């Protein structure tokens, strides 16, 4: 057929989410992450037009263009679920290698909510050597495009000079010689980020850190305390400020753990005492309730007020945390492993596998990993392949249960575990995107909030 006589037929996307709230109509497509906001009255009128979408192009061409560009309406031949499955498989098979290393399970603090047993431990020279061999093995096979070395624990910076520095330098040099991208990250309590340490982070290609505060000063210092340190809160924030001044490349994810009846807005001014305005735009605030706290979705508005205050003081704020990689967890990836201090290899550090007598995997002396009972392949599961998930408009920004829970046979909807309503969080995100952009009609959520 001649192209000029070929008419494209359209259908509605299965992943359109339309929310009316406080005078606005919020339109969001969870597959494309595109959105727009209009008045509620106009939104009701436009929703009625969707009953005859193939006539919208002629009668309301500008509206049609917005819907088409945002993926709200799509050609009838497009199979969105096939797209999601393909993106999921691509994410699982990604050539970016995420190598987490735990030099120790010990820690200088003993936080009451911590899921880990802080046993005295340190990675041996033999395990360090085997990790180097593992890196050599990865690069020699020429199957990875990036190596992300991430430090975890315990408290990894207890052994900066002995383990982190030499192993990072080795990995960095090997990747440079192989033409493979490389960078480092770390989850730490921040206590050992001394002036000497932070002065070396750029050379080691550290780009991101996650550090946790346990509420405002008085609460944090009840949870984290150490002999000879009057305030761990003050000490860690000084270290953070020094680190961000020593390196222009580092982004800090500052997680704020909270209990509903203990978090107050005082924490903002307390943090401001130590963090100078010129580096606040490289700190992303991520509030999280401690996992033992009961879910209370009505508490979101209290946290929202706190986030607004942080934003007004120059910090980045995590307004919404959708899955953007088409997997529910990084452990879902084929190329993700966590190597414990003793050479045991796991896929999840948030469960008891680190302490199991039968390790899920073991790092061999030749640098390869031997998995027990195809343990690694079980983590490449498709936990969204069930009727509830496949029929959910939020599938592309959720992607189902965490692999561990899926393997254990759990079937709950993980949204029930969130401390906020999906709609409240999405509205807050879109509102702030519009507040910060004069032309928000073309916004998409990939820019972050």
What residues fall within each predicted segment?
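The canonical Cys-X-X-Cys-His
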Residues: 107, 111-114
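Short, charged low-complexity linear segments at domain edges
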Residues: 75-95, 310, 314-318, 323, ...
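N-terminal [4Fe-4S]-dependent radical SAM core
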Residues: 11-37, 60-100
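A C-terminal junction/extension of Radical SAM enzymes
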Residues: 2-10, 279-284, 288-355, 397, ...
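Conserved glycine-rich "GG(E/T)P / GGGxP" loop and the immediately following alpha-helix
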Residues: 100, 104, 117-285
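Flexible mid-to-C-terminal extensions adjoining Fe-S/redox cofactors in radical SAM and related proteins
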Residues: 355-449
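Detector for the c-type heme attachment site
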Residues: 114-119, 393-397
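Short amphipathic alpha-helical recognition elements used for nucleic-acid or partner binding
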Residues: 37-53
